[in-house]
Amino acid sequence: MGASGQITNLEENGKKMNARNSSFDYAVAAFRAAPHLGVSFGLVPFTTMGYNFNASGTTTLGNETLKSTNTYSGDGGLHQVYLGAGWQPVKGLSVGANISYLWGDITKSVVLSFSNASVSTLSKNYSASVASYKLDLGAQYLLSLSDKNKVILGFTYSPKHKIGGNPELVTSTINTNTSVVVSDTLSGNGLRLDLPDMYGAGFTYNYDNSLKVGADFTVQRWGKLPQPTFASDNSSTSSMQYGNYLTRKKLTLGGEYCPREYDRIFVRRVHYRAGVSYATPYYKINGNNGPKEVSASLGFGIPIVNSMNNRSILNISGQWVRQWAPGMIKENTFRINIGLTFNERWFMKWKVE
C-alpha cells in the first residue's frame, strides 16, 4: 500500500503560485494460490482530476468595455478495484489477466463573469458518471543467460471499449441583480466515454538478483477515439467528434541496486532506485497539443527487520515532474511517495518434528 504528497509550482507569463495536495495511491495484495498459479487483488486510483484557475480579459458590449473573467474548475476521477491471476504453463513463460471494476464521477465547469453586475453571468457545467469494467492482459518470458544473468521480456494489452458515463452539459444564465437563473440541460443518447487500446512492452535485466535495469514503452491510442462534444452556440445539439485526442506514448527507464539482499550489514540490504520518463500529450487544448511530461525519481527500499519478519520493505522516493507546452501554464511538481511492502509468512507451511 502507498500514499503520496506533492507541491506543484505553476508558472505563466512570469507569475508563479504553489499548490499542495496529498493522495492515497494503492492497496494491493498478492499470494500463491497453487503451484504455478498466483492471485492478486487491490484498489488503485485510475484517474484523478482537480483544478481551479481563471483567465481575465476584456469584452466590448455596445459602447462599454468590460473586464471579463473565465473561471475553470474540475474535480473527481475514477476508482479501480481489480482481481488478477497469473499462470506459468511452462518454465520461463507466464501469462496473466486483470479484470477491474471502474466507477466514479467527473465534473468540470466554466463560469464567465463581468465587472458590470448588470451583465448576466454565464456558466457551463459538464458531468459524467461512470460504472464499467476494464480488462488487462499480459505475458512475460524469463530468459536465463547464465546462473547470474537473466532477462525478462514482457508485453501488456488492454482492449478498447465503451464505458458510458452519460455525459451531460448544463448551461446557465445568472442575473446577479435579480438572482434569476435560467438553465438548460443538454444530453444525448449516443454520447459516451471510451477507453482506448493500450499496448506496453518492456524488458528487465537482472544480474545476480543485485542489479536490475529495465525499460518500458507504452502506447495509448486516444487519437482513435471520439469525444462527446456539445455545440458552442448554446443550441441543443451534441455529437461524438474526432480530433480532440492524441495517441499518447511514454518511455520509462529505471534501475535498482541492492548489494546483498540478505547480508548481515544493514546498509547492504537497502534497495537503491532511480528512474526517468518522457510522455507525449493525449489531448488538445483550443486546437493545440497539450503539455508534454518529463519526470525523474530517486528512492530507497529500506528493510523492516524484527523477530517475526525480515522481508518487508519501507519504500520512500522523491519524484520531480515537469509538464509544459508553448503558450500554456508550466507545472513543476515535487512528489514524496511512501509505501509499505509486506512480505509476511501467512502462507508458510509449518513443520512439526
Can you describe what each PLM-predicted range is?
Residues 1-353:
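Subset of outer-membrane beta-barrel
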